[in-house]
């Protein structure tokens, strides 16, 4: 670990402290969600005039890890952050209203020619899977990939939870 690493951690922690949702979370959850992102360079931190304004992190999950994550969002281990090709937004912090700027910047990342998933929660108790198309991905290809993704995830969840028709 070096000074740059600690500066990143400090900037991200400051954003968490200014987020109504994140400020309630524990230091353990901060470490679990932020340190693997920094170590794997799977994050974006926006800074304006030397002040952090927004942050997001992502993990590339295998189908098995994805099912585990959907069941328990605090279940990711550091090794699982790069376990597959199913990209998930793990953390999104924009306490000063810079979400649109963060979306614009994330969609311009060259390897974002894929779809991105996240769990959204309005109640903090339940979430829904949201889907975003990477900026370099055309709509037709994105739809085809999303349909395939839904089929594979649906089958895996059905198997995991023993759902029947």
Swiss-Prot record:
It is found in: Cytoplasm. Its EC number is 2.3.1.-. The active site is at 22, 91. The keyword Transport does not apply. Pfam families: HlyC. It catalyses: a fatty acyl-[ACP] + L-lysyl-[protein] = N(6)-(fatty acyl)-L-lysyl-[protein] + holo-[ACP] + H(+). Keywords: Acyltransferase, Cytolysis, Cytoplasm, Hemolysis, Transferase. Belongs to the RTX toxin acyltransferase family. One of its GO terms (biological process) is toxin metabolic process. This is Leukotoxin-activating lysine-acyltransferase LktC. It comes from Pasteurella haemolytica-like sp. (strain 5943B). The gene is lktC.
């Amino acid at each position: 670990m070096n000074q740059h690493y600690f500066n990143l951690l400090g900037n991200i922690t400051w954003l968490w402290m200014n987020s109504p949702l994140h400020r309630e979370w524990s230091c353990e959850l901060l470490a679990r969600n932020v340190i693997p992102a920094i170590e794997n360079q799977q994050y974006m931190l926006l800074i304006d005039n030397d002040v952090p304004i927004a942050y997001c992190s992502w993990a590339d999950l295998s189908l098995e890890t994805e099912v585990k994550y959907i069941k328990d969002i605090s279940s990711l281990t550091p090794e699982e952050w790069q376990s597959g090709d199913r990209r998930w937004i793990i953390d999104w912090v924009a306490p000063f209203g810079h979400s649109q700027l963060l979306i614009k910047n994330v969609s311009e990342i060259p390897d974002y020619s894929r779809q991105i998933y996240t769990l959204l929660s309005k109640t903090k108790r339940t979430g829904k899977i949201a889907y975003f198309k990477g900026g370099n991905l055309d709509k037709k290809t994105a739809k085809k990939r999303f349909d395939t993704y839904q089929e594979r995830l649906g089958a895996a969840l059905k198997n995991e939870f023993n759902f029947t028709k």
